[in-house]
């Protein structure tokens, strides 16, 4: 009995340590959702690039087996407007222990040609963000009340996201800043961060190999201004096409804190396919930090739908996959 109680106490401390800033990001957390052929997850600049109106539904569950562990559900949609612009929409719901957040983004992106013959393109993206954040105290232990928190707290945040994307043939690199406006509200909690801006950098290269196949190494970097954390994903993805332009992909992702490169947070496979107008992507991550002994890993599932195919007259918005 004492061992079980002590185990719960240790687990609670670990959760508070690892996840204390997670719920303060005021944005849907980014894990491996973007690797399911959905880079719009991490940058507004990808809105409108492609030949279809796209809708992607994602479910994400972190640290399976841990009670009240982080989870989120999100809808991502984007489509092209005329030949060189795009619009997008994100709706999400996220929970982590006693915190809840939800909201959405509305995006506009514009794409220009830097050099037609060398296939160099530049994209700009802007999103308006609306977020609600709530702290639920109904599950707090009344025998050990927190002197700073005696009732439910909630707040809303209106903010913006900006991004830039450069493409040169099969190379791409994007930079994005999320929640660029500093916070003008307070939940009156001592450890609440005053700075909300998150920075993301994403780059990769698509290598054409034999037998209608592609190999795509990529790097995704995130920096959280609230507490100075930064994490990096190292990814590799193999894509195989058939004669009908359907394809499947397999790969792997390796995530680590940048001050602990040799101690990964998580590592795991990614798989998926596109068949006609439907795509499915799945990723599994094995937790390798102090929570490893208490959970069965992290799962992410994305189901995508593509509608209203219309080829663009501008190469800067044509599909980046298998040009």
Task: Mark where each language-model region is.
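Positively charged n-region of N-terminal signal peptides that target proteins for export
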Residues: 1-9, 114-116
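Sec-dependent N-terminal signal peptides
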Residues: 9-18
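Sec/Tat signal peptide C-region and signal peptidase I cleavage site
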Residues: 19-23
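Subset of outer-membrane beta-barrel
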Residues: 24-323
């Amino acid at each position: 009995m004492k061992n079980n109680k002590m185990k719960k106490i240790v687990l609670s401390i670990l959760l508070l340590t690892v996840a204390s800033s997670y719920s303060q990001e005021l944005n849907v957390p980014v894990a491996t959702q973007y690797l399911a052929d959905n880079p719009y997850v991490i940058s507004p600049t990808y809105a409108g690039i492609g030949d279809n109106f796209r809708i992607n539904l994602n479910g994400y569950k972190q640290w399976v087996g841990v009670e009240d562990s982080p989870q989120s559900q999100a809808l991502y949609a984007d489509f092209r407007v005329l030949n060189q612009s795009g619009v997008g929409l994100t709706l999400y719901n996220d929970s982590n222990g006693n915190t809840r957040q939800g909201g959405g983004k509305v995006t506009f992106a514009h794409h220009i040609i830097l050099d037609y013959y060398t296939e160099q393109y530049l994209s700009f993206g802007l999103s308006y963000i609306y977020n609600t954040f709530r702290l639920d105290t109904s599950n707090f232990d009344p025998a050990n009340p927190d002197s700073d928190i005696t009732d439910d707290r909630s707040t809303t945040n209106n903010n913006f996201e900006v991004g830039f994307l450069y493409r040169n043939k099969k190379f791409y690199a994007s930079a994005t800043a999320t929640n660029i406006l500093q916070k003008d509200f307070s939940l009156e909690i001592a450890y609440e961060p005053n700075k909300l801006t998150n920075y993301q950098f994403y780059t990769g290269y698509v290598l054409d190999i034999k037998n209608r196949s592609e190999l795509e190494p990529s790097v995704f970097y995130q920096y959280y201004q609230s507490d100075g954390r930064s994490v990096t994903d190292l990814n590799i993805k193999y894509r195989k096409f058939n004669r009908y332009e359907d394809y499947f992909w397999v790969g792997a992702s390796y995530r680590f804190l940048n001050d602990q490169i040799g101690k990964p947070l998580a590592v795991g496979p990614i798989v998926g396919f596109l068949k006609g107008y439907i795509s499915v992507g799945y990723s599994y991550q094995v937790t390798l930090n102090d929570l490893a002994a208490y959970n069965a890993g992290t799962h992410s599932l994305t189901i995508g739908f593509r509608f209203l195919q219309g080829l663009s007259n501008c190469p800067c918005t044509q599909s980046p996959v298998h040009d």
